[in-house]
Regions:
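Extracytoplasmic
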Residues: 156-177
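Active-site-adjacent loops and short helices of periplasmic peptidoglycan-processing enzymes
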Residues: 1-150, 159-160
């Protein structure tokens, strides 16, 4: 075990061995936090597991973009009417933390954000993320949208076991189709 001490300026941290899943060190990793954009880890996982054809087309709409923009959420930059693929949405959700990409994935996978969030919460429980509850797929603040770094670590360790998901989250730059 390694001690973080005062060298880490953040209030919460966790370092996990990616191969074994063992916690190397942590700082307040069991505290309840608002996961914000870390939500998109679960969004991408659930969409990836729910949509068989990652090259299936999706038409972005202004109705998806506008409310997210008005709420001040980060966007990937897709335009209303733009024809993209589910794969583009996965990268758009993961890399620039695009809320419109995340919301579009929810629609593509389940037809509504509500149904998709139910699936996210079910998946969290299956992974053993017992201190996590999602209220949306974008990471927008909500008092009941919570997790812990321990739970996020469980999720990340699972994601990194999948080569395609590891590639998505490990990519530096992506150009849409």
């Amino acid at each position: 075990t390694v001690t973080l001490g005062d060298t880490v300026s953040c209030s919460h941290a966790i370092l996990i061995n990616a191969e074994t899943g063992a916690v190397i060190t942590q700082k307040n990793a069991e505290d309840i936090i608002f996961p914000a954009s870390m939500t998109k880890l679960m969004t991408v996982l659930v969409a990836y597991e729910s949509i068989a054809d990652l090259d299936a087309p999706f038409r972005m709409t202004q109705e998806i973009i506008d409310p997210l923009y008005l709420d001040g959420l980060s966007l990937a930059g897709f335009a209303g009417g733009e024809e993209i693929t589910v794969r583009d949405l996965l990268y758009g959700s993961a890399l620039p933390s695009g809320a419109e990409a995340s919301y579009a994935l929810a629609i593509a996978a389940c037809g509504s954000e509500e149904a998709f969030v139910d699936r996210m919460n079910d998946r969290a429980l299956l992974l053993g993320m017992y201190d996590t509850h999602f209220e949306n797929c974008t990471g927008a603040h909500h008092n009941d949208h919570v997790s812990t770094l321990t739970d996020i670590g469980i999720l990340m360790a699972f994601i990194m076991q999948n080569d395609e998901l590891a590639e998505i989250f490990g990519t530096y730059q992506y150009t849409t189709t």
